């Protein structure tokens, strides 16, 4: 069968990949975002490949099947460090992160050229709720009393408005656990009135974040302060990258990610900071001052950068003699709102780079191993724990965009103290995606 010119054209397009992150996935999103020939998309309906990375236990399989069946044909699934569904015949599995980009590119090319058959659907072709022949008019609705018209729940104005007294219909839905704007694993039941978050209830907490190996090593023996601080700065840059993606600033997001990939003790964040300030991000995209604010008790529970953004000068590095030799003093904001937490990332990145340069010059290692200040918060007698229960208090009353950017500024996942091997790619697949830093 002849291959049409349209198929040949599609075969050479970047591989459109929707990433479903399971437990212990690691920074695969950041890795693939700079890989040449890969395009990460925000919806499974825009993808030709579903990439599942990390452990997805049985309790999440139904959610993953729903994502799987949303991809338009022809499509395929690729499993990385994850067990494929038993119902799949000859699933593609790639556990080597370095081989993942080329494997995705080859899969897309085979699909588009007709060399690989499209994957089969896993779920029956049925509406989410039965509706045919139900209700007064046979479409599932119950007049003005709700029901499920054509299988979809009808919005109802059953709750008072939180903002201006205008009672709009309330739409309740469930989001997660594989939505790219949420921490991996987080699932919530949300009620919206217009674009206002009326309620937010966490139904499943996020998967625990995986600790970088250098922080685990620091709990066992003295390690280079420069290595710790460069890793801390890179972590904050990755958080900033994800936040910029959610805010809809892809060019600055990609620039931030490339800066993180090239990060070294001589790196200077001044140019990136200047671009962020001049772009109008704080004025045009981030919530207004006071929005997403945490009180002192919430800030202490969150710990780490979120606490320091609320004016709490708590940082375990202050208790390390060699950090004190470097003149370390916590950098803090005072407002404790969403914008303050974004500023805190930038200030801590700049501080970490300065500490790394000084530590290299003095050849300093950590003096304490009984505790460590991780990028997620303090790790002393226990790891940072899950704090997603705070979201039910913090997010209601915010507009949808404000809520997503507030959530992006909060590190609510617990910490998994067992590190992964390095998941960053070599330069082979980063070629062709360079931008100015």
Question: What kind of feature is each model-predicted range?
Answer:
Residues 97-437:
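Metal/cofactor-centered catalytic core regions of large enzymes
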Residues 1-35:
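N-terminal, charge-rich interaction modules
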Residues 34-38, 62:
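Glycine-rich, highly charged phosphate/nucleotide-binding loops
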Residues 37-47:
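Short acidic low-complexity segments
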Residues 18-23, 48-49, 52-56, 76, 80-82:
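Structural motif
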């Amino acid at each position: 069968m002849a291959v049409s010119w349209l198929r040949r054209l599609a075969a050479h397009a970047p591989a459109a990949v929707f990433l479903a992150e399971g437990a212990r996935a690691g920074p695969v999103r950041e890795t693939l975002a700079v890989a040449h020939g890969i395009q990460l998309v925000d919806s499974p309906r825009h993808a030709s490949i579903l990439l599942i990375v990390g452990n997805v236990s049985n309790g999440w399989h139904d959610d993953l099947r729903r994502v799987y069946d949303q991809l338009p044909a022809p499509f395929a699934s690729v499993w990385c460090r994850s067990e494929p569904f038993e119902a799949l015949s000859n699933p593609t599995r790639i556990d080597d992160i370095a081989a993942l980009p080329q494997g995705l590119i080859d899969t897309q090319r085979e699909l588009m050229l007709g060399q690989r058959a499209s994957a089969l659907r896993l779920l029956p072709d049925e509406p989410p709720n039965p509706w045919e022949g139900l209700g007064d008019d046979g479409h599932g609705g119950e007049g003005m009393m709700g029901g499920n018209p054509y299988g979809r729940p009808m919005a109802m104005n059953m709750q008072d408005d939180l903002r201006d007294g205008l009672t709009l219909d309330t739409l309740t839905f469930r989001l997660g656990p594989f939505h790219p704007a949420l921490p991996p694993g987080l699932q919530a039941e949300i009620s919206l009135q217009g674009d206002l978050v009326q309620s937010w209830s966490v139904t499943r907490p996020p998967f625990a974040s995986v600790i970088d190996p250098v922080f685990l090593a620091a709990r066992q023996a003295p390690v280079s302060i420069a290595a710790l601080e460069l890793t801390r700065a890179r972590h904050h840059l990755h958080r900033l990258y994800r936040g910029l993606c959610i805010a809809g600033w892809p060019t600055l997001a990609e620039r931030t990610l490339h800066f993180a990939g090239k990060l070294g003790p001589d790196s200077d964040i001044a140019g990136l900071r200047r671009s962020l300030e001049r772009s109008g991000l704080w004025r045009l995209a981030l919530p207004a001052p006071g929005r997403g604010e945490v009180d002192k008790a919430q800030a202490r529970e969150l710990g780490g950068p979120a606490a320091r953004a609320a004016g709490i000068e708590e940082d375990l590095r202050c208790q390390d003699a060699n950090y004190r030799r470097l003149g370390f003093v916590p950098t803090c904001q005072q407002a404790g709102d969403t914008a303050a937490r974004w500023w805190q990332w930038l200030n801590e990145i700049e501080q970490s780079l300065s500490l790394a340069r000084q530590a290299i010059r003095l050849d300093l290692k950590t003096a304490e191993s009984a505790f460590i200040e991780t990028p997620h918060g303090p790790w002393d007698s226990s790891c940072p724990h899950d704090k997603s229960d705070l979201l039910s208090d913090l997010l209601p009353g915010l507009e949808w965009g404000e809520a997503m950017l507030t959530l992006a500024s909060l590190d609510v996942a617990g910490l998994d103290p067992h590190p992964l091997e390095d998941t960053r790619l070599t330069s082979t697949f980063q070629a062709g995606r360079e931008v100015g830093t």
